[in-house]
Amino acid sequence: MRNFKSKWTLSLLLLTLTLHNCSQNSTKTKKKSSHQAYSLPEVSKTMDINSTVERGAMDIYSLARSEPSSNVNYKRAQDNIDTRYGKLEFPGGYPTEATIKKVYDELDLQRATQLYLDMYPALSMHGMLKGNIRDYGVNSSSVISVTANRLDSKGMYLTGNTESIYLFLVLDLKKDGPTVVEVPQGVMGPLDDHNFLFVADVGPTGMDKGKGGKYLIIPPGYDGDIPEGYFVVNSKTYANFSFLRANKDIVGEGERAMKFVRENCKVYPLETGPRENKYQNVSGVDMNSLVPENAEAFTWMYELISYEPAEAFGKELLGRLESIGIKKGEDFNPDTRMVNIMNQAALEAVAMSRVIAFNNRDENGKVYKDREWESPYITNNSTFYEDDYIDIEARQVFHFTADGITPAMAARMPDGLGSRYQTTYKDKNGDFLDGNKNYKLRMLPNVPVAMFWSVTVYDPYSRCEIKTTQPYPSVSSQKEPKPALNDDGSVDIYFSNELPEGIAEQNWVQTLPDQGFFVYIRYYGPTAEFHNQSWIPNDVELIY
């Protein structure tokens, strides 16, 4: 009778939970999972539980009572296991020497592969810092590098912007301590730390509200006095990088832009006060910020954790790094075996990143239901938080294809402020864009921007501006000469190897044969029509 009662009670509990969850599901819209397409081989079930009941909704007592007795279902581990990396043998329960080698090789490969993915944001920032120091000759925080003639394709930044005047700042708070950054009205952009985490915005979305001012960047662990009169921000790392930018309509180009920066921008340690700054025009200068796709990336990881405080990374990440021989405060000398594993891990991690970025399985990646345009910020925030977790695939999509973390490009800003980006790797038919073919994008009239819009073409191998005979692979509403308009005010932009007959050159972006390309639309100062989607861009269309 007691057994009958317990079964009857369990049945009532399962029914109640089923009805409760059905009610919940009817009122709450859930994100659809695309993972169902990636099925695993069927395995035998060891738990007999009603499939309509969400196990996560059950208390621990009900959960345990719903399972068969452990001793009934116990099955010892297998002596022989077939895996994708070979057969594993455990005669008598213990591994053979061959199995030990295979498992440790695979374990190290998996850990190294995941570390490459997890540390990609920090590696990307490390590449930015290295590229500026190595290729631009930056040797102190008081060197301000300016793309006074705009950023051309020689500057290999991930999906760099061809239309703005950039000011690149390399800050070293370990060397300089609290550092002052003076910015004028008309300059905007983020300051990001060595982990590529957002520190502060400058400009209309920053503390200066677009009026300019003095920012004081405080290093980790600093406990000294902080004077008044500054916009004070705290960084969790010593090394920081800023991508400030200005509209050429405000600051001009070339020498005019350099004059504006020299007269209005300064960077110096708080301790020393203003010191001599060096201003250099880096337009047309070759610079590579890309993360190595081989074992060198793991040397970068070692450099990162060696320079920054341990608190910037956390014990879990540092523990996984230590498991493959990368430990803070100790030499990093991988043997031939580990170098080979790290080379393979980098290749596999990059392959995963390319698939995640170019064919993302998250349905929230699409901006519009019936268009191919995607947002680099799938979560619509710069932290990649989704409720109580971090969307690690969304984070990888962004950092593998873009630079510069700021809420101003992700979160909904007031109409006319901030900027929003959209990208597509595919044409209207859902096929990847092919450099051997000819395409057209019609920018419909009345693009919803308070400032300007631009369309830029990138190389899927580097994710940087595509390198062709055009130094600036873009078309924009502020381009000179202006792109030709159709009678209704729309703009047709063409993508092909050669200029199509009868098409104005300012409406054409050159592509490369035998490789793909992808396209970004940038909206500067997006207005209400952008946010409420009463204006929707066309897809890129195949001509032939």
PLM features: what roles do these ranges have?
Residues T18-N21:
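C-terminal motif of bacterial Sec signal peptides marking the signal peptidase cleavage site
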Residues S23-K31:
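Bacterial lipoprotein signal-peptidase II cleavage site
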